[in-house]
């Protein structure tokens, strides 16, 4: 099974807690690691996290730097778990963190394990444009997604891997991502089991 994760609500969470919007991204790190650990225990074979999009790079400089740093830290934290890691995104852009370029080919870390994909500076148009020039998606090493889980209550995919998620079930968690609890994952999985 492959699940996609859209960890939304970091900025709204920060505002609710009287913090700067930028501070919210750091609070999304621990939930990402906890969810990965649960997914591995549950037997999930592949998981894809949505870090940030090409469009997110149009935000104020402080926010861009904050989510870039959070994504670099998230990849390093997640990689401690024993994963087959792939970071996908437009590496030709200045918005793509230099530190993550070494992971743009799938890399077994700590013996490998669950296939972990992390979308960084990802754009669906950028992904699909490669079909015309090279005959395949930039994200061709990412398999079809069975379920997308989005935190933060929004009911949209925001350009999340449109080819791989075309038949995915879409589960929305109302909580903001930094408020993640273990029960969120199990609730989503129970919901998925009831789908056709």
Residue ranges and their predicted role:
Residues 1-196:
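Flexible, compositionally biased loop and terminal segments
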């Amino acid at each position: 099974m492959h699940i996609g994760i859209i960890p939304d609500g970091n900025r709204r969470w920060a505002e609710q807690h009287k913090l700067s919007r930028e501070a919210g991204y750091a609070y999304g790190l621990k939930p990402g690691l906890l969810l990965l650990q649960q997914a591995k225990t549950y037997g999930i074979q592949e998981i894809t996290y949505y870090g940030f999009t090409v469009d997110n790079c149009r935000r104020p400089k402080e926010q861009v730097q904050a989510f870039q740093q959070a994504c670099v830290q998230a990849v390093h934290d997640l990689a401690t778990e024993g994963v087959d890691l792939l970071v996908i995104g437009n590496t030709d852009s200045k918005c793509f963190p230099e530190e993550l370029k070494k992971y743009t080919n799938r890399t077994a870390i700590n013996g490998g394990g669950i296939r972990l994909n992390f979308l960084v500076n990802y754009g669906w148009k950028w992904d699909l444009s490669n079909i015309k020039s090279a005959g395949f998606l930039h994200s061709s090493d990412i398999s079809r997604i069975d379920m997308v889980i989005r935190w933060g209550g929004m009911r949209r995919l925001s350009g999340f891997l449109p080819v791989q998620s075309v038949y995915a079930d879409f589960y929305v968690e109302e909580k903001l991502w930094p408020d993640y609890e273990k029960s969120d994952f199990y609730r989503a999985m129970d919901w998925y089991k009831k789908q056709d």
